[in-house]
Each structure stands twice: as structure tokens, then as C-alpha cells.
Amino acid sequence: MTADELRRIAYQVPFKPFRVRLASGEQLEIARTLRTTVAEDRAIFGVDEDPQTRVARRMRMVPLREIVSVEVAA
């Protein structure tokens, strides 16, 4: 996945939740806008959302080369 491809998904208006599948088999659920920052070779995702505060509990820095696919919710 390229930085531009991920930016198009992460910053689309209106925002649509998406799932990032990593080479390790791990999946990251991105449910809200402004939870993703994309650089040229990596992305930072806000994950593990607190259901009461709706704040991400952790940040994950992922090299783009480790992203196998991204699925956008319908």
C-alpha cells in the first residue's frame, strides 16, 4: 500500500470506518476520523478505543510495507 492510497481512505469525506490487515495477521479497526496519520513510509493509528470516552487508548506505528490490505466499511 502506498502513502497516497492510505491517505485517500483515511481522510475521505464523509469518513467511513476501515480495517487494516497486517502481514502478521493482526487487524486494526479504525472507527473514527482523525485516528490516522500517514507519512511516506509508515502510518500511526489510534486503536483500542475506550467506549465511554471514545478516545484511543493506544497508538500503533506501522510501516506501510506491513499493510496487506485495507477494507472500507460499506
Report each predicted region and the residues it spans.
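Motif-centric detector for short Cys/His coordination patterns
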Residues: 1-74
